[in-house]
Amino acid sequence: MSSLPALDLFLSKYQQAYVDQLGEQPRYYAQEQESDCVVGEMDSDGAVFWQGVVRDNPGQFENVESALELTLCPEINTFYGRHFSAPLFFDSKWGSGELIQVWNQTDFEYLQQNIIGHLMMKKKLKQEPTWFIGVLDDEDKMLTVNNADGSVWVEIPGELQSTKLAESLDEFISLLTPRVMPPVKPIEESMPELDHPGIWQRMKLMWNNLRGK
């Protein structure tokens, strides 16, 4: 598995930042989804304290590669398959945003389906393959990795990558600062398929808007 030391370091700094500023570990509205990340009991508001953990059995993307007949940049296995974690909020010189992570194995499988959907959309649009790692808070800007060379870019759904942020995923993560903030309650959606915690709702709304164009 490819190594992303910056991700391990960021997770460590993330946990410590919450302890230093709030005197507690970060909290997350997991909507009663179990995870090895959970520390203690759910609070009265429905949030859980959590801590990122290294998976006993790392997640892999061979099934996605086989389904699409495409070789993925190896960093995808480390970024999404090494840990279980809640989404990670950050500040950067490009603004604030979130990095996607997976909460449990079911979440990982859900992620793979979305990666496949994203790559199929890129193929349909006759664009080079990319895969997403998060979003910026500025409107509908995704953070994506160029599958050919591993560089990190800003991408708006349906368009080509527009602004290059770093030569590699490890370099990009090393430029981020953990953002300490209260847990964000998921927005209630009327469609059952959108009922998923946190960042996924934003990602799905972006793609739904694209399909509606």
Swiss-Prot record:
Keywords: Cell inner membrane, Cell membrane, Membrane. It comes from the Bacteria. Pfam families: Syd. Gene3D superfamilies: Syd protein. One of its GO terms (cellular component) is cytoplasmic side of plasma membrane. InterPro entries: Syd, Syd_sf. It is found in: Cell inner membrane. It is a peripheral membrane protein. Interacts with the SecY protein in vivo. May bind preferentially to an uncomplexed state of SecY, thus functioning either as a chelating agent for excess SecY in the cell or as a regulatory factor that negatively controls the translocase function. Belongs to the Syd family. This is Protein Syd.
